[in-house]
Amino acid sequence: MSRIGKRIIEIPSSVQASVEGSKLLFKNNKEKHELETHNRVKITLENNQLSFQPVGEDAQFRAYWGTYGALANNIVIGLSAGFSKTLEVNGVGYKVALGHKTLDLSLGFSHPVKYPIPAGIEMVVEKNTITIKGSDKQQVGQVAAEIRSFRPPEPYKGKGVKYSNEVIIRKAGKTAKK
């Protein structure tokens, strides 16, 4: 029995939900998201409460039950409150600036790195901190991971791009000979 799948998802008043066959449609005043279930789960929407039931008794259907429950819950949270990730840029000469539809990063390469900001993502830059906001949890995490991958933090001095809550395990440098 899936503990995540059997949870009932409360839909706030700021989000409208509707079921069309095997599709779930969510929208608020700005955006809309769609979740296709491919008839792997049975969808029930009553009184702004959304629930799922597995179609069969097979283990695969029970796995989809929890997966679609989590995906629908993430869409509801994203449309009502949104998701955000914060990145920190540490290092001498490492700079971040917000251009027109691009994020300009100076990370010690011979050239500046220009990252195009995808649709549905909003970025805020303060000093050397990048805040990535959006309604799609997967897209926010993907953008943060792509920016971090340009210069991941190194273990000796901690220079690079890291998540704000990430702990970098430091290594000792070379020791002098006696």
UniProtKB/Swiss-Prot annotation:
Keywords: Ribonucleoprotein, Ribosomal protein, RNA-binding, rRNA-binding. It holds the Pfam family Ribosomal_L6. One of its GO terms (molecular function) is structural constituent of ribosome. Part of the 50S ribosomal subunit. Belongs to the universal ribosomal protein uL6 family. NCBIfam families: L6_bact. This protein binds to the 23S rRNA, and is important in its secondary structure. It is located near the subunit interface in the base of the L7/L12 stalk, and near the tRNA binding site of the peptidyltransferase center. This is Large ribosomal subunit protein uL6. The gene is rplF.
